[in-house]
Regions:
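Residues embedded in well-ordered secondary-structure elements
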Residues: 5-7, 32, 53, 62, ...
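Gly/Pro-enriched, hydrophobic low-complexity segments
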Residues: 122, 127, 131-207
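Flexible, processing/modification-adjacent segments and terminal tails
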Residues: 19-30, 36-40, 44-50, 55-57, ...
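Short, exposed beta-strand/loop patches in secreted or surface proteins that constitute
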Residues: 34, 62-65, 79-80, 124-129
């Protein structure tokens, strides 16, 4: 009569392993540690979007600067600034929308991908690895998120993210490719402070 209980225990352990794969955690923690210990990070990113049929929807070049929980993202004339509490999203013309960091939790920004802090928001599993690279799948714990899963390619030698493929709930995909990353960038604190004077005089700000 003990056999069913042995199998039950086995499957419970297997389920737990699949939710938080220890092998994947080691790799992810190395990314997080490198980001946490950095005083400034400068990243060049390429984002390629495709619809559910695989048709390319566009390519964007993005510059991202990070310092702790603050970041400044620029794509063409558009900007996103986060001072750690408030996110300012400039449309490149004359409008800024403001939101709290907590309000942005349903989306997955490049900053969140690169931060390496996955434990709180994801289950994860190691899909494949070589001596130099690892493929890790992230599944959001909160099913209200705007995406189904994220597939990471990690450079194990550099302990850095190489790319991330994000699949949304409509089966559209976005490939985020890290072109270059500098973990020792010197970034001034005022870069992450909102400065009304740098924007057009007719700027409108919406909460």
């Amino acid at each position: 009569m003990r056999i069913p209980f042995i199998f039950l225990a086995f499957f419970v352990c297997l389920s737990t392993f699949a939710q938080k794969d220890p092998s994947a955690k080691v790799i992810l923690d190395q990314i997080g540690s490198k980001v946490k210990n950095s005083k400034g990070i400068l990243v060049s990113i390429q984002m390629v979007s495709k619809n559910s049929q695989g048709k390319a929807l566009g390519t964007k070049q993005i510059s991202l600067k990070m310092k702790g929980d603050k970041y400044y993202l620029k794509q063409g004339l558009m900007e996103i600034l986060c001072d750690g509490l408030i996110i300012y999203n400039f449309d490149g013309v004359n409008t800024i929308s403001k939101s709290s960091v907590a309000e942005s939790d349903q989306t997955l920004s490049p900053q969140k991908l690169l931060a390496g802090n996955y434990d709180k928001d994801f289950n994860y599993s190691l899909l494949a690895q070589t001596t130099s690279n690892a493929t890790i799948e992230l599944i959001p714990l909160d099913k209200r998120k705007s995406f189904q899963k994220v597939t990471l390619i990690v450079d194990k030698v550099k302990s850095a993210l190489s790319s991330a493929s994000i699949l949304d709930k409509s089966n559209n995909s976005t490939l985020v490719k890290v072109l270059s990353i500098n973990y020792t960038a010197v970034l001034a604190d005022n870069l992450f402070l909102f400065n009304r004077a740098k924007y057009p005089k007719n700027l409108e700000i919406f909460d």
